Amino acid sequence: CQLQNYPNPFNPSTKISWQVPVSGWQTLKVYDILGNEVATLVNEYRDAGSYNEEFTINNLQLSSGVYFYQLRVGDFVETKKMILLK
């Protein structure tokens, strides 16, 4: 699985992209530095393939700093870091 976001650092939005080789239930969530869930971008069954979702802070009261995005596909979990610069 290839998981990345661009641009990073970002403000006000970043595109998170990934590829998965198998079909399955996918969840993509964003967390703050304390582990609090900020957003759920994906929570559905998807086929194998390449995907991308945009994370935008427009309606969220988020401060500058480090955030994490986590992709879960079946038993697979990957977490990456991104930085919001205001």
Positions of predicted regions on the chain:
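Short, flexible loop/turn segments at beta-strand junctions in immunoglobulin-like
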Residues: 45, 59-61
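Generic detection of short hydrophobic beta-strand segments and adjacent strand-loop junctions
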Residues: 43-44, 53-55, 80-82
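Short, low-complexity Ser/Thr-rich regulatory SLiMs
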Residues: 7-9, 45, 86
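Generic secondary-structure boundary/loop-capping signal
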Residues: 7, 38, 80-82
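C-terminal tail/sorting-segment detector
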Residues: 48, 64-86
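Glycine-centered coil/turn sites that cap beta-strands in beta-rich domains
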Residues: 1-6, 10-31, 40, 52-59, ...
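Solvent-exposed serine/threonine-rich low-complexity stretches and specific carbohydrate-binding patches
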Residues: 38-46
